[in-house]
């Protein structure tokens, strides 16, 4: 599933190619793509068609386009969702779910019309239209994600509040990092990478962490995510691409995730894979020793 860096790469592409344009007649080709929009596909198309796009924003793994109607077009990419900006005459992708034609904006060729396409092979992603609520800083946030915590790259992220909440969790450290109501944007890949960088085991009890360990962990999370952003995110297959259909290449820089039995870049010990929450966790048994009082 795309995590913060991948979603931010898509957001930046939307900011470049879609903000300032307006939508033409929206066409929903597969109703499952808008299943979270309770009034249905026809209402979704009617609410988006003709609207102008004023900004592209993100919180954690969610992104949205603010519309001049005062509402937001919210997107969650799920496992395989893609938002692509394509020439309107380009052949339809096999798993094209929603077409959102774009009017020409300043600097774009009106003779080469484009459209935003939502493509989703596994149909776990979705689009919906939602009202905006104040997020406490005077900025609008779609109401359905108002429970999602700020992410570590958000300028308004409160490190002290996070540290206190983390220690109150009394759970495994990785489980806490994956809790989007505590800190958003982190998934399996970047949790493993940040834990490797900070030399903490995923089963470390959160209540046992010192303030300096939390600070080291947050610094690692930010460093990993900034590095991933610079490389366009992590792509293991063709399911994650940016708005121009290009894959990221941070997979070449991973130190832990997916590197079972390969030598640790820091000490040479083979990376080990363990099962956690029905998924895989990767760590170095020497650099990240399992704590004596591990929670799992």
Swiss-Prot record:
CDD domains: EcFpg-like_N. Pfam families: Fapy_DNA_glyco (PF01149), H2TH (PF06831), zf-FPG_IleRS (PF06827). Its cofactor is Zn(2+). Its EC number is 3.2.2.23, 4.2.99.18. A zinc finger (FPG-type) spans 255-289. The keyword Transmembrane does not apply. One of its GO terms (molecular function) is damaged DNA binding. The active site is at 2 (schiff-base intermediate with dna), 3 (proton donor), 61 (proton donor), 279 (proton donor). It catalyses: Hydrolysis of DNA containing ring-opened 7-methylguanine residues, releasing 2,6-diamino-4-hydroxy-5-(N-methyl)formamidopyrimidine; 2'-deoxyribonucleotide-(2'-deoxyribose 5'-phosphate)-2'-deoxyribonucleotide-DNA = a 3'-end 2'-deoxyribonucleotide-(2,3-dehydro-2,3-deoxyribose 5'-phosphate)-DNA + a 5'-end 5'-phospho-2'-deoxyribonucleoside-DNA + H(+). GO terms for biological process: base-excision repair. Binds 1 zinc ion per subunit. Keywords: DNA damage, DNA repair, DNA-binding, Glycosidase, Hydrolase, Lyase, Metal-binding, Multifunctional enzyme, Zinc, Zinc-finger. DNA binds at residues 95, 122, 169. Monomer. HAMAP family: Fapy_DNA_glycosyl. Involved in base excision repair of DNA damaged by oxidation or by mutagenic agents. Acts as a DNA glycosylase that recognizes and removes damaged bases. Has a preference for oxidized purines, such as 7,8-dihydro-8-oxoguanine (8-oxoG). Has AP (apurinic/apyrimidinic) lyase activity and introduces nicks in the DNA strand. Cleaves the DNA backbone by beta-delta elimination to generate a single-strand break at the site of the removed base with both 3'- and 5'-phosphates. NCBIfam families: fpg, PRK01103.1. Belongs to the FPG family. This is Formamidopyrimidine-DNA glycosylase.
């Amino acid at each position: 599933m795309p995590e913060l860096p991948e979603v931010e790469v898509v957001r930046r592409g939307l900011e470049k190619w879609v903000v300032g344009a307006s939508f033409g007649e929206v066409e929903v080709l597969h109703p499952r793509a808008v299943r979270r929009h309770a009034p249905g596909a026809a209402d979704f198309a009617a609410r988006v068609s003709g609207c102008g796009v004023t900004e592209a924003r993100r919180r954690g793994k969610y992104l949205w386009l603010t519309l001049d109607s005062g509402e937001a077009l919210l997107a969650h990419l799920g496992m395989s969702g893609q938002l692509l900006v394509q020439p309107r005459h380009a052949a339809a992708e096999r798993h094209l779910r929603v077409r959102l034609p774009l009017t020409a904006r300043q600097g774009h060729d009106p003779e080469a019309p484009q459209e935003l396409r939502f493509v989703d092979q596994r149909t776990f992603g979705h689009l919906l239209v939602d009202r905006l609520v104040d997020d406490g800083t005077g900025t609008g946030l779609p109401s359905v994600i108002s429970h999602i915590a700020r992410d570590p790259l958000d300028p308004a992220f409160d490190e002290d509040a996070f540290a206190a909440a983390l220690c109150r969790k009394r759970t495994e450290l990785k489980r806490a990092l994956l809790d989007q109501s505590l800190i958003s944007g982190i998934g399996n890949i970047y949790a493993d990478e940040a834990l490797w960088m900070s030399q903490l085991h995923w089963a470390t009890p959160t209540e046992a962490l010192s303030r300096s360990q939390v600070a080291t962990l947050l610094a690692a999370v930010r460093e990993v995510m900034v590095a991933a952003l610079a490389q366009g995110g992590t792509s293991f297959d063709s399911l994650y691409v940016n708005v121009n259909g290009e894959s990221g290449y941070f997979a070449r820089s991973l130190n832990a995730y997916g590197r079972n039995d390969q030598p640790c870049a820091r000490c040479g010990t083979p990376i080990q894979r363990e099962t956690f929450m029905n998924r895989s966790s990767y760590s170095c048994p020497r650099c990240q020793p399992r704590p004596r009082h591990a929670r799992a």
